[in-house]
């Protein structure tokens, strides 16, 4: 669907207290976002080959969270560095990026991922494995865009309703606690 680009092997002894945040596997969160505690690196020259930007789709390629997909979205920084074993789904002219986000969160993607993961001490997946996955993709980029936007809207609605459900549960808990005093 979109070629997967690997990251850069930053050395931990070169981390800084501030600078460009590095997206590591631990920053790819299960809720589909990128966050948590970042480490930083001083800005490097010619960093385009491992730079990430808001809206980029990343994939954990090693460890217990292999296959976890997140979308980089932050107001704090407009530039991030991509650590080794964090894959970036590259943007192409023939594939709408919203559609890519839908595909990589699909059951079909997860099925193919499970097929290539080798059981062992640490699961790993390669860019070559991911690039070989097979999907039915409309040739028309506008159609891809409509599909991607539809599912993005649906995901937002699900998130909104989940927040309302969580809020209602909390209110119920408080009311029951106060009622039984």
Where are these regions (language model features)?
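Feature detects amphipathic, helix-rich regulatory segments
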Residues: 1-181
């Amino acid at each position: 669907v979109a070629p997967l680009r690997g990251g850069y092997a930053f050395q931990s002894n070169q981390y800084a207290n501030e600078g460009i945040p590095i997206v590591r596997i631990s920053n790819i969160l299960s809720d589909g976002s990128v966050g948590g505690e970042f480490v930083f690196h001083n800005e490097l020259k010619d960093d385009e080959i491992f730079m990430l930007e808001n809206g980029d789709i990343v994939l954990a390629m090693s460890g217990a969270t292999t296959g976890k997909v997140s979308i980089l979205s932050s107001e704090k920084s407009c530039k991030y560095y991509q650590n080794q074993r964090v894959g970036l789904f590259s943007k192409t002219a023939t594939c709408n990026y919203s559609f890519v986000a839908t595909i990589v969160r699909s059951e079909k993607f997860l099925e193919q991922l499970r097929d290539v993961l080798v059981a062992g001490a640490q699961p790993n997946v390669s860019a070559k494995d991911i690039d070989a996955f097979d999907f039915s993709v409309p040739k028309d980029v506008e159609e891809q865009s409509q599909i991607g936007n539809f599912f993005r809207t649906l995901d937002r609605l699900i998130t909104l309703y989940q927040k309302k459900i969580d809020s209602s549960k909390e209110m119920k808990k408080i009311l029951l606690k106060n009622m039984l005093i």
